A protein has these predicted regions:
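Signature of N-terminal electron-transfer/Fe-S-associated modules in redox systems
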Residues: 1-150
Length: 150
C-alpha cells in the first residue's frame, strides 16, 4: 500500500483524530496488517502520538502488526463447538495449510486463528473464512470449502 492510498483513506475521514480506529480498520482491511510506516503516516496526518496508535493496534485483536494471509480463517473453540468437533476442523486445516492456530503460511495465503465464540453455538462446529460463517462443518466439508479460497 503506497502513501497516496493511505492519504486517501485518511482524507475520506477528514483527517479527524476521532476516526483513528476507522482509519486503521480500513487500512487493515486492504493491507491485512499494519506496517510501521503506515502507523507513522497515520500518526503524522491525524496528529495522534505513535505510542497511542501502537497501543490501540496491540490492544484489539482485529489489528495485526505482522503480515497476515489473504484469507483469514477462524475456528470457534467455544464450548458448543469444542464438544461438536472443532479440534477435528483445526487438525484438518493444519494438515491442508501447513500452519497451526496463530500462524500465517509463508506465501501469505492463509492465516489461521481460534476464537472463543462467534455467537452461532447451534451451528457448531463453526468456521469463518474472510468473514463468512460456515456451520456444522465436517473435516470433509472443510477440505471442499478451502478449495474455494486459493
Amino acid at each position: 500500500m503506497d502513501k497516496a492510498r493511505i492519504d486517501q483513506i485518511i482524507d475520506k475521514h477528514n483527517a479527524d483524530p476521532s476516526s483513528l480506529i476507522q482509519v486503521m480498520l480500513e487500512i487493515q482491511g486492504e493491507k491485512h496488517w499494519l506496517p510501521k510506516y503506515v502507523l507513522e503516516q497515520v500518526s503524522e496526518r491525524l496528529q495522534v502520538p505513535l505510542t497511542r496508535i501502537q497501543h490501540i493496534a496491540t490492544f484489539y485483536k482485529a489489528f495485526s502488526l505482522v503480515p497476515k494471509g489473504r484469507h483469514e480463517i477462524n475456528v470457534c473453540v467455544g464450548t458448543a463447538c469444542h464438544v461438536r468437533g472443532a479440534s477435528r476442523i483445526l487438525d484438518t486445516l493444519t494438515e491442508l495449510t501447513g500452519i497451526k492456530a496463530g500462524e500465517t503460511d509463508l506465501e501469505l495465503k492463509y492465516s489461521l486463528e481460534t476464537v472463543n465464540c462467534v455467537g452461532c453455538c447451534a451451528l457448531g462446529p463453526v468456521m469463518e473464512i474472510d468473514g463468512k460463517i460456515f456451520g456444522n462443518v465436517t473435516p470433509t466439508e472443510t477440505i471442499d470449502l478451502l478449495k474455494n479460497y486459493k
